[in-house]
């Protein structure tokens, strides 16, 4: 059961980091359209 908790923490942390980077400059992919 500990592995599940650690996995969840890792995924949540990665998600937060990804969202932070994505919201910093989001119009990078959209501007190329």
UniProtKB/Swiss-Prot annotation:
InterPro entries per record: PSII_PsbT (IPR001743), PSII_PsbT_sf (IPR037268)
Major location (coarse): plastid
Cysteine disulfide partners in this protein: none
Membrane-traversing stretches: 3-23
GO terms, biological process: photosynthesis
Annotated membrane topology: Single-pass membrane protein
GO cellular component: chloroplast thylakoid membrane; photosystem II reaction center
Entry keyword set: Chloroplast, Membrane, Photosynthesis, Photosystem II, Plastid, Thylakoid, Transmembrane, Transmembrane helix
Keyword Ligase found: no
Record carries keyword Lipoprotein: no
Location in the cell: Plastid, Chloroplast thylakoid membrane
Protein function: Found at the monomer-monomer interface of the photosystem II (PS II) dimer, plays a role in assembly and dimerization of PSII. PSII is a light-driven water plastoquinone oxidoreductase, using light energy to abstract electrons from H(2)O, generating a proton gradient subsequently used for ATP formation.
HAMAP family: PSII_PsbT
Annotated family: Belongs to the PsbT family.
Oligomer status and interactors: PSII is composed of 1 copy each of membrane proteins PsbA, PsbB, PsbC, PsbD, PsbE, PsbF, PsbH, PsbI, PsbJ, PsbK, PsbL, PsbM, PsbT, PsbY, PsbZ, Psb30/Ycf12, at least 3 peripheral proteins of the oxygen-evolving complex and a large number of cofactors. It forms dimeric complexes.
Protein's recorded name: Photosystem II reaction center protein T
Native organism: Piper cenocladum (Ant piper)
